[in-house]
């Protein structure tokens, strides 16, 4: 029994396979689970178990995703693999499967293809911090020079999108041969697992980040003052600490004079907990849903940003018609809707349901935001799109 307990203490890292259709992402996913299970213990997953991905909903969007888990001696990995290109786009934009690092699969027989480029760009836009390359199907290429050429192309492509192409680990392998139990190629899977361990740093846990709580509700308690409620997104709030109230209006400062959960008074509220925070010297009408409480100086309000968005198709309950420049929907951040205007990329006249597109958004009120913040696009309470802040502009 003691072993089970030990497993849980390993750092947990989220990864996924990305890359062009038919380059071997799902075969590689199966090979990793199989080879690591054989070497270090754990459950192997067959190709067809992974390929038959269940549907799930994230922000009202249907995404097909397979989740597998595996262990190396030092870490526990949760790995996501998507069957279709559209699923990757949706997954990365909604953040349904947030990745601490990605394995880019490139077939040595083809070299980089259009979706290879698109997935690298998406990775950059949505903040995938690290990419490791698995050069697949190397058993089918005899020419060493050809492999070097493909490797060089991949490095150039990564550098083009601000990943460190020259320093990126590239493993030459064959997922299929490894899956079939060929020892020479199994060794390449272990080499890849070694890079997952060494190249992707341990992710910072939510509790170690600066305090932030999106405000859901505001109450006034006679004799005690104003209480805001919500779920702590990150960090810890302790009684007596200063906080800032950010977004929508001018930023204000206050002090937390109490934290409560389930009607009990606590010394602190931590990431993941639903709490009420009592604020000193703030009137009920000076604060509203949609603002955030944050550690002073850690987050600023912004109105203009570059984003990567996915527009729901008609089948997903989205719009039935395209939209054009001048479109003014609501952008739903954390707990509230804010109206905004959009600028489309040069040469783009209209956006169709089912498209993914880069757009610059200008909100009518400032919202507390950082790069990587997810949002929904809504019309009258109905979700018509999902997006991520790629870059705050002002």
Curated annotation (Swiss-Prot):
- Post-translational modification Phosphothreonine, affected residues: 383
Q: Which residues carry this modification: N6,N6-dimethyllysine?
A: 57
G2: region residues = 60-64
Report the NCBIfam families cross-referenced here.
Answer: EF-Tu, PRK00049.1, PRK12735.1, PRK12736.1, small_GTP
| Encoding gene, per UniProt annotation | tufB
Effect of altering residue 383 to V? No longer phosphorylated by phage protein doc
Q: Give the reaction(s) catalysed.
A: GTP + H2O = GDP + phosphate + H(+)
* Localization: Cytoplasm; Cell inner membrane
| Impact reported for residue 382 to A | 25% loss of Qbeta viral RNA polymerase elongation activity
Q: At what positions is N6-succinyllysine found? A: 38, 177, 249, 253, 295, 314
Residues the record lists as N6-acetyllysine modifications: 314
Q: Which SUPFAM superfamilies match?
A: EF-Tu/eEF-1alpha/eIF2-gamma C-terminal domain, P-loop containing nucleoside triphosphate hydrolases, Translation proteins
- Name of protein: Elongation factor Tu 2
Q: What is the lineage of its organism?
A: Bacteria, Pseudomonadati, Pseudomonadota, Gammaproteobacteria, Enterobacterales
Q: Where, by residue number, does GTP bind?
A: 19-26, 81-85, 136-139
Q: What is the effect of changing residue 262 to A?
A: Still associates with EF-Ts, very little Qbeta viral RNA polymerase complex forms
Q: Where is this region: G1?
A: 19-26
Region annotated G5 sits at 174-176
Q: How does it sit in the membrane?
A: Peripheral membrane protein
Record keywords? Acetylation, Antibiotic resistance, Cell inner membrane, Cell membrane, Cytoplasm, Elongation factor, GTP-binding, Hydrolase, Magnesium, Membrane, Metal-binding, Methylation, Nucleotide-binding, Phosphoprotein, Protein biosynthesis, RNA-binding
The impact of changing residue 349 to A is: No change in binding GDP but higher binding constant for EF-Ts
